[in-house]
Amino acid sequence: MSKLQDVIVQEMKVKKRIDSAEEIMELKQFIKNYVQSHSFIKSLVLGISGGQDSTLVGKLVQMSVNELREEGIDCTFIAVKLPYGVQKDADEVEQALRFIEPDEIVTVNIKPAVDQSVQSLKEAGIVLTDFQKGNEKARERMKVQFSIASNRQGIVVGTDHSAENITGFYTKYGDGAADIAPIFGLNKRQGRQLLAYLGAPKELYEKTPTADLEDDKPQLPDEDALGVTYEAIDNYLEGKPVTPEEQKVIENHYIRNAHKRELAYTRYTWPKS
């Protein structure tokens, strides 16, 4: 293992193997402890995309909220559907929601807000690319979740995990923004393992991962966008050997996107060297 890989493995906290029952218990306890430590929290808010990550986090949150209520703590889980117009994988979103069984479902179509933002920028002489418009979608989705959380005395739960964090494969202040990120420390295959253990439909955790933000490239697989497979990323995070080409791609993503893993730099925190 190279020195940089060792540093990254330590930072990303991924275990070489996990016990599903123990891991789920730890994840639920983290969520519950956070809520119990902040008496103002009356709701937890999460956007549901129909993919592996939001399905897993949604199920964990609902299980945690159920236990909190049994312990006398008043708390609600709000699952949010955030389509941009008509969502191509809407059936999978509904399948995920049936599995999660959230207390409450809110649907907000982000298309009018995103299109107006893009148009307003265009009128100001700023013409966004399709990729940049995709980031607008991600930020609008997170803005809506924080608005709901503010209205309902809640917090926003994120879906960031270590296979995503290492590559910076998320929108800064978009899907990368949240109050808590329960599944950080898991890689992609471990997330699948937990969903299988929880009895999720195979379609939800065997689905090809995609951010699906670009109009010109609908359902673009994450692995195509990243230039490396999740299998390689997972192996790297577990301290296993990968090919030199895979190592270079992963480490380049890690270095280039370091700013996404930090709050705004100050003159005291900017790593100049």
Swiss-Prot record:
Entries under InterPro entries matching the protein: NAD/GMP_synthase, NAD_synthase, NH(3)-dep_NAD(+)_synth, Rossmann-like_a/b/a_fold
Enzyme Commission (EC) number: 6.3.1.5
The entry's keywords: ATP-binding, Ligase, Magnesium, Metal-binding, NAD, Nucleotide-binding
Pathway per the UniProt entry: Cofactor biosynthesis; NAD(+) biosynthesis; NAD(+) from deamido-NAD(+) (ammonia route): step 1/1
CDD domains reported for this sequence: NAD_synthase
Enzyme class: ligase
Subunit structure: Homodimer.
Primary role: Catalyzes the ATP-dependent amidation of deamido-NAD to form NAD. Uses ammonia as a nitrogen source.
Assigned protein family: Belongs to the NAD synthetase family.
Protein name: NH(3)-dependent NAD(+) synthetase
